[in-house]
């Protein structure tokens, strides 16, 4: 499942990028 960064991680400076599965969580932490 792919979610926009702002959906999964809150509004970050990369919010216009997409991240899939746990990758976004790893980037955000």
Curated annotation (Swiss-Prot):
Disulfide bond annotation, renumbered to this chain: 2-20, 9-24, 19-28
Main subcellular location: secreted
Any one GO CC term of the record: extracellular region
Known role: Intraperitoneal injection into fish (1 nmol) provokes hyperactivity and erratic swimming in various directions after 14 minutes.
Keyword Secreted: yes
UniProt keyword Secreted present: yes
Organs and tissues of expression: Expressed by the venom duct.
Organism, scientific name: Conus parius (Cone snail)
Keywords: Disulfide bond, Knottin, Neurotoxin, Secreted, Toxin
Protein location: Secreted
Domain comment quoted from the record: The presence of a 'disulfide through disulfide knot' structurally defines this protein as a knottin. The cysteine framework is VI/VII (C-C-CC-C-C).
Protein's recorded name: Conotoxin pr6a
Molecular functions per Gene Ontology: toxin activity
Signal peptide stretch: none
């Amino acid at each position: 499942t792919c979610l926009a960064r702002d959906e999964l991680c809150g509004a970050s400076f990369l919010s216009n990028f997409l991240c899939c599965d746990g990758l976004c969580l790893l980037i955000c932490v």
